[in-house]
Structures are given as C-alpha cells and as structure tokens.
C-alpha cells in the first residue's frame, strides 16, 4: 500500500486583512502537510480571540504537533491528550501573566497506510469529499451543536432564539479540562467509501461559515482542490470576512 500526496492548497488570512488600520493579527495557525512516520500530518488551530495570547496559543499547539518525533494512530488515540495538556500548561505558565486564559481549538489529521486519524477539539472542521459534496467528519464543540445533539431545540428554534453558533464548550486551555474527540477510519474503509483518490479539507469557522451559506460550486470547481480553495477564498473576501479564515485542502492517491 502506498499513499501519494498529489495536491495541497491553503490560505490563512486575518479578518482585518482589508482594514490594516485595525491591526488585528491572524489568530489562526496551520500545519501544512508534512511527512511523518510514513504518513502525512496536517491541521488547523483557531486561537480564542476573546483572551490575550490567542495567536501564541494556536501557534504553540501547531508547532508542538509538527515537532512530534514519533507519531502513530495508537499514540494519537491514547497518549497525546495528556502530553499536550501538560506541555500547554507549562507554556502558558512561562508567558506573561495576562496570557493565563489563552486558549485554542485544534483539528488535525494523520494519514498513513493503516488509515486516517482525526484528532479534534473545538470548532474547526474536517471534511472529506464524496463525489461533489463535502462530508463533515467532526462535530463542533459548541453550545449550539450540543443543544442540537440533545434535541432540546431544532435548528429553526435555535436560530429564532439567536443562539450563537460560536460559543465553545471545549478547547485547549490551562483552566478547563481537555476533552478531545478521536476518530479513526481504516485504510480499506477509506478506499471503499471514497475511492482511491481522496480529498480532505480542514477549515476554521471563519472559512466554513461561508461554505455553510451555500454548499456548492460548479462540478469542475468541486473536482479540483485548488479551484475549490480559490473559489471559497473569493467568496469570503467578496462577502467580507467575519473572522480570521483558514483552509487546508489536500488530495491523496491511495494505491
């Protein structure tokens, strides 16, 4: 079995890119696909902008994952959580005291010839393309999604009540317990369900907000990772960003 990375396309921009006078930095960070332990690792983190140190927090977790010496599906499922929690707490304690509440989301993938691992906390999203549709593989850790999952309110009722879709219930932080989701899709299941050519996308909420508004482009655009990335970026910038916006698009061939 052999995996070939055939295409990568990405963007990561500050919400105020077109209003430099506001001088707000981009608090998203990303892991551009890199080779690790006979597989490929890539991800996105979104620092919580309501606290000081949001950029530093998102950068730290991405840098930490990038620098893992050994990586395996078993490690991601059973060991990473506690190690990341301890190292993040140590990092925050080493910073200025005003960074004590710095927090971040993190969603990343590791793909090798055993399968696809998805490690996720917060509200970035991982999608996989099936025909001309994007299938969401992660669940948002938000109050909005929690109310939906428990069937307390319908989506229509939540919108009528103007419940925010961005209020997080979980994140990487020094003051709340880290409670991530982990998903594993075996190699053969990936091929059976999605074919020998798979496209995986990771987006921050500033990017998928505009995808949710209209979940389609032309068949040609949906069939091309670079065209899709460019089209979504144009849509965001034409409508006006509401948050920092980040996307990584990948295409792999599974032999």
Where are the language model's segments positioned?
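PP2C/PPM-type serine/threonine phosphatase catalytic domain
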Residues: 1-255
